[in-house]
From Swiss-Prot:
Function field: Produces ATP from ADP in the presence of a proton gradient across the membrane. The gamma chain is believed to be important in regulating ATPase activity and the flow of protons through the CF(0) complex.
UniProt name for this protein: ATP synthase gamma chain
Quaternary state and interactors: F-type ATPases have 2 components, CF(1) - the catalytic core - and CF(0) - the membrane proton channel. CF(1) has five subunits: alpha(3), beta(3), gamma(1), delta(1), epsilon(1). CF(0) has four main subunits: a(1), b(1), b'(1) and c(9-12).
Top-rank taxon, per record: Bacteria
Family that this chain belongs to: Belongs to the ATPase gamma chain family.
GO MF term set: ATP binding; proton-transporting ATP synthase activity, rotational mechanism
PROSITE patterns for this protein: ATPASE_GAMMA (PS00153)
SUPFAM superfamilies cross-referenced by the UniProt entry: ATP synthase (F1-ATPase), gamma subunit (SSF52943)
Alphabetical list of Gene3D superfamilies matching this protein: 3.40.1380.10, ATP synthase, gamma subunit, helix hairpin domain
Membrane topology annotation: Peripheral membrane protein
Keyword terms, alphabetized: ATP synthesis, CF(1), Hydrogen ion transport, Ion transport, Membrane, Thylakoid, Transport
Length: 315
């Protein structure tokens, strides 16, 4: 009977744990939806900004552009912006980003370049601080769905490092959202910007949908609904001055989008991890229930045998 009680207690513990993992999965799923809504809300501004920049590029393509954010100089020091999460329970999300960051730092060392780190997320901060890596700034405790103001604070730090020539290039490592079960740490150069190579944000968005009792992500192409800018648009100010004013906005927008993708990747990883944990808990409950029933049946059989044996002894 003691064995039966132990199995019952373990089944109860696993059921309680499964309730927690299922709740965390549902919360992560809801936040993925919110992340999608925020991406869509910021799209009109991003599209229009890209259109204006393209128009300015066209006008300035035959001119020598001398702007601080476009200045390319010999690279001696690189600032690496590493984006991870503040919490765990999200599978290999944080580990994969940190591993890619270490690989990139080794590549920079092999090229004879110095580096400094700007870190977003407590997990990366804890890892690199314990190992005495050079760190310029740490940002933690950000909203799970990043805001433009938070992206602006980080962009200001990066601009300060670049414009003061403390660093000659700024690179970003974040996790690109692919699907609920797939994400990819990528490296992207943020500074210096290239007026001939500005790219609009990826015209692919993700939508969280349900099919049966399962959640899935569908990526789909989205075209801008904004009217195109006229090719003969007249600017009151010098196009070069306008470009100089818009480039920081473009940097902020690129950084915000990367933070949003990273947040969606973390939430999807957490949702997948909690879903797997719930499935494993359910399978374990089934196995333990079967063991409990077998043990109970064996105990009942043993009691019957003892009763029969006792009856036979009394004859």
């Amino acid at each position: 009977m003691a064995n039966l009680k132990a199995i019952r207690d373990r089944i109860k513990t696993i059921k309680d744990t499964r309730k927690i993992t299922e709740a965390m999965r549902l919360v992560a799923a809801a936040k993925v939806r919110r992340a999608q809504e925020q991406v869509m809300a910021s799209r009109p501004f991003a599209d229009r900004l890209a259109q204006v920049l393209y128009s300015l590029q066209t006008r300035l393509r035959f001119e020598d552009v001398d702007l601080p954010l476009l200045a390319k100089r010999p690279v001696k020091t690189v600032a690496l912006l590493v984006v991870t999460g503040d919490r765990g329970l999200c599978g290999g999300y944080n580990t994969n980003v940190i591993r890619r960051a270490k690989e990139r730092l080794q590549e920079l060392e092999a090229e004879g370049l110095k580096y400094t780190l700007v870190i977003v997320g407590r997990k990366a901060a804890q890892y690199f601080q314990r190992r005495d890596y050079p760190i310029d700034a740490v940002y933690s405790g950000l909203e799970q769905i990043p805001s433009a103001s938070e992206a602006g604070q980080i962009a200001s730090e990066l601009l300060s490092l670049f414009l003061s020539e403390t660093v000659d290039r700024v690179e970003l490592i974040y996790t690109k959202f692919v699907s609920l079960i797939s994400s990819k740490p990528v490296v992207q150069t943020l500074l210096p910007l290239d007026p001939q190579g500005l790219e609009t944000a990826d015209d692919e968005i993700f939508r969280l949908t349900t099919r049966g009792s399962h959640l899935e992500v569908n990526r789909e192409k989205v075209t801008s609904t904004l009217p195109a800018l006229p090719s003969d648009m007249i600017f009151e100010q010098d196009p070069l001055q306008i470009l100089d004013a818009l480039l920081p906005l473009y940097l902020n927008n690129q950084l915000l989008r990367a933070l949003q993708e990273a947040a969606a990747s973390e939430l999807a990883a957490r949702m997948t991890a909690m879903n797997n944990a719930s499935d494993n808990a359910q399978a374990l409950i089934g196995t333990l229930t079967l063991s409990y029933n077998k043990a109970r049946q064996a105990a009942i059989t043993q009691e019957i045998l003892e009763v029969v044996a006792g009856a036979e002894a009394l004859r």
